[in-house]
């Protein structure tokens, strides 16, 4: 299988459009300790997607039915 190299580059708008279309999840975790004593722990999960992408995901995993039944 050969790898093709292209000289075309993506613009920032194309990259943002692709991220919003597909969605991206950033999961971060950090811990600060001193002499074995934990001073600070940070956990973060950031989800970036368009509303349409999120609604497709929510429907696929059944989140929209739970919200409709609660109302």
From Swiss-Prot:
Residues 26-34 are annotated as: Beta-strand 1. GO terms for molecular function: structural molecule activity. The gas vesicle shell is 2 nm thick and consists of a single layer of this protein. It forms helical ribs nearly perpendicular to the long axis of the vesicle. InterPro entries: Gas-vesicle_GvpA-like, Gas_vesicle_GvpA, GvpA, GvpA-like_CS. Its main location: other. The gene is gvpA. Residues 12-22 are annotated as: Alpha helix 1. Belongs to the gas vesicle GvpA family. Coiled coil: none annotated. Residues 35-37 are annotated as: Beta turn. It is found in: Gas vesicle shell. Residues 38-46 are annotated as: Beta-strand 2. Keywords: Gas vesicle. The keyword Metal-binding does not apply. Gas vesicles are hollow, gas filled proteinaceous nanostructures found in some microorganisms. During planktonic growth they allow positioning of the organism at a favorable depth for light or nutrient acquisition. GvpA forms the protein shell. This is Gas vesicle protein A. The lineage of its organism: Bacteria, Bacillati, Cyanobacteriota, Cyanophyceae, Oscillatoriophycideae.
């Amino acid at each position: 299988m050969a790898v093709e190299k292209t000289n075309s580059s993506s613009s920032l708008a194309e990259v943002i459009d692709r991220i919003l279309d597909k969605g991206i999840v950033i999961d971060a975790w950090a811990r600060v300790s001193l002499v074995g004593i934990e001073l600070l722990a940070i956990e973060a999960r950031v989800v970036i997607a368009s509303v349409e992408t999120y609604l497709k995901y929510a429907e696929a995993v059944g989140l929209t039915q739970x919200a409709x039944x609660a109302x």
